[in-house]
Amino acid sequence: IAFAVPTGTVKGFHMAAAHSDSPCFKVKEKPELTVEDHYMRLNTEKYGGMLMSTWFDRPLSVAGRVFVRANGEIVEKLVSVDRDLLVIPNVAIHMNRTANDGMKYMANVDTLPLLGGKESGGILPIVAKAAGVAESDILGSDLFLYCRGEGTLLGENEEYILSPKLDDLECACGCLEGLLNAKESENI
C-alpha cells in the first residue's frame, strides 16, 4: 500500500489497486532432497494460482530474503542468485508416451527443481555466497524460484511483449508509475 498525503485539507481519495504477488514456487526450509542416490532436488510448494507447465525446461534461480545474525542482532538481507541454477525437467516423451494428451501435475512430485548431483552441497551455501554472509549466520529464509528468461518484444512490428509474470508485475508497475507521476492535489 502506498499513498501521498496532500499538504492542505484532504478533500477525498484517488485510488488504484493491483495485485503484486506473482505465482511461483516457494522453497521450503531444509529443502534438499537426494533422489535415488543420484541427484539433488529442492523441496518447493506452489504459491498462488499458476500454470505449472510454463515452469518446465527453463533456466531458474532463487531470490528472496535471508535472516542473518549480525552484531548481536537479527537482520534481513535481500538476495538473488544471479545465474542459471535450477531446472524443472519434463520427462522425455519415450518415458511418458501420453505426455501430449494432457498432464495433471502434482506439485510435490512433478515440479521439484533439479539442483545438482548427489554430491551437491545444497542451496544454503549458494544463497549465503550471493548474500555476502557466512552460511552459519543464516537463521532463516524466505526464498522463491524465478524464471531467468528475459522479457522480449515479438511480432512482425514488435507489437507484443513476452515476459514471465507480466500480468502481475505490469499492474503493480502501472500503479506505482501513476502514483509517482501524479500531480499534487487535495486528495489522498
Name each region found by the language model:
Residues I1-I188:
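N-terminal hydrophobic/helix-forming segments and targeting peptides
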